[in-house]
Curated annotation (Swiss-Prot):
Stored CDD domains: GATase1_2
Disulfide-bond pairs as recorded: none
Tree of life domain: Eukaryota
Annotated SUPFAM superfamilies: Class I glutamine amidotransferase-like (SSF52317)
Protein location: Cytoplasm; Nucleus
Gene3D superfamilies cross-referenced by the UniProt entry: 3.40.50.880
InterPro entries: Class_I_gatase-like, Peptidase_C26, PuuD-like
Name of the protein this chain belongs to: Putative glutamine amidotransferase PB2B2.05
Glutamine amidotransferase type-1 domain location: 5-228
UniProt entry tagged with the keyword Nucleus: yes
Lineage of the organism: Eukaryota, Fungi, Dikarya, Ascomycota, Taphrinomycotina
Length: 253
């Protein structure tokens, strides 16, 4: 059986292995893409895009200067790469899953803004606890929408590893998951092609059933894109080339 090809965008400092394992477990074939990939070099046959966690989105992307109270860990090359990947996905109607930073990237891409340091903006300091990545830091509440259907519950426990957070919502996006202190923790487009979560499901995929459900939903949407591409192109899909191997595209900055 052919599996959909998933472009996984990470930073050079990321540990991509948990994401790769989650994609494979859900039935996808991952391609790991690093910052610096040019728009005209995006693999043309990808069926889905995952924007992983990592450095903060540069505040100039949403019209702000650096907050002196916020960590200044940014990657402008990765920002540019992922903007190009989102452009590509929207043009091709490819599903996108944003995780932590990836969720924030999606929000800013569509014109939203971010809190640069949620712990200094009136939110309880539970969003970056000094705990292992799999530590369940707090609960989130799902409102009616695609994410609630995927997660299968109104309230779930999640981990939390972030400084930034969604402030104003991007155009065309809905905030359908919130933390118990009121911070947006999940976004989605009306058609379900764009999903973003603030937590790290790849780190708790063996601990919380809703994590695997999220990846399975995304892979199933990607499979649908793969099938549609095959129908309209009349060309066999190339995922057999990637099966049983993980392809990395390391582009130097």
């Amino acid at each position: 059986m052919e599996c959909p090809i998933i472009a996984l965008s990470v930073g050079f400092s990321n540990n991509s292995q948990p994401y790769v394992e989650a994609i494979i477990k859900a039935g996808g074939c991952p391609i790991v893409i690093y910052p610096g990939l040019q728009r005209n070099s995006i693999p043309p046959n990808i069926d889905g895009i995952i924007l992983a966690g990592g450095e903060s989105v540069h505040p100039n992307r949403y019209g702000e200067d650096f907050d002196p109270n916020a960590p200044k860990s940014v990657d402008v090359i990765r920002d540019s790469t992922e903007w190009g990947m989102i452009d590509f996905a929207l043009k091709k109607k490819i599903p996108i899953l944003g995780i932590c930073r990836g969720c924030q990237v999606l929000n800013v891409y569509f014109g939203g803004s971010l809190y640069q340091n949620v712990s200094s903006c009136g939110f309880r300091d539970i969003h970056r606890p000094s705990k292992p990545r799999h530590y369940l830091a707090h609960k989130v509440m799902a409102k009616p929408g695609k994410l609630k259907n995927i997660l299968g519950s109104n309230v779930i426990d999640v981990n939390s590893i972030h400084d930034q957070g969604i402030k104003t919502l991007g155009m065309g996006l809905q905030s359908t998951v919130i933390s118990d202190d009121g911070l947006c923790e999940g976004i989605e487009s009306k058609d379900g092609l764009i999903i973003g979560v603030q937590w790290h499901p790849e780190a708790i995929i063996d601990k919380q059933p809703h994590s695997l459900k999220l990846f399975q939903y995304f892979i199933n949407r990607s499979k649908w894109h793969m099938k549609q591409s095959n129908i309209f192109s009349n060309v066999p899909h190339e995922s057999s080339f990637y099966r049983n191997s993980i392809i990395s595209i390391p582009i130097a900055p």
